[in-house]
């Protein structure tokens, strides 16, 4: 996995579309895991630099979790904005909020809903447009009309 993490960062950094999986508990921890795996291959690189590279390569993290009822559920969609000074800002865009857990007759039932917590950055919006995501679809996620 260490060479795969390094290759994925490199490919994504050259504007190739890369979709990958990594075991981690949400946005920041996923980037940490990618950075630690990449550091195994490139020990000379600082983990902080690798974290920034991972965040630039993978600005969106989709966190999936297996719940008590054995269902896999998208729990969070998080964007990481890398500021000019290198600071990483994690914004949860959507979160699955569990309202209640029920246990009846040996079976778990989990009730919840998706909640929009933040709007994606303009940088991510532009990147998605360049990548071919239709404007009307992005409008739904931005929560506003897009200008030409």
Regions found by a protein language model. Name each.
Residues 73-148:
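NTP-binding/hydrolysis catalytic cores, primarily Walker-type P-loop NTPases
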Residues 61-63:
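Short, well-ordered beta-strand core segments
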Residues 1-57, 68, 75-79:
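Conserved P-loop NTPase nucleotide-binding/switch module
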């Amino acid at each position: 996995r260490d060479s795969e993490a390094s290759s994925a960062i490199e490919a994504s950094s050259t504007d190739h579309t890369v979709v990958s999986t990594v075991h981690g508990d949400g946005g920041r921890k996923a980037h940490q895991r990618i950075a630690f795996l990449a550091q195994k291959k490139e020990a000379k690189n600082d983990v902080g630099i690798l974290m920034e590279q991972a965040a630039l390569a993978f600005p969106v993290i989709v966190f999936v979790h297996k719940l008590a009822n054995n269902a896999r559920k998208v729990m969070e969609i998080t964007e990481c904005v890398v500021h000019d000074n290198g600071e990483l800002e994690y914004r949860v865009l959507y979160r699955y909020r569990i309202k209640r857990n029920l246990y009846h007759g040996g079976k778990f039932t989990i009730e919840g809903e998706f909640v929009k917590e933040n709007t994606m950055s303009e940088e991510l919006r532009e990147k998605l447009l360049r990548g071919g995501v239709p404007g009307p679809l992005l409008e739904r996620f931005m929560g506003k009309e897009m200008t030409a």
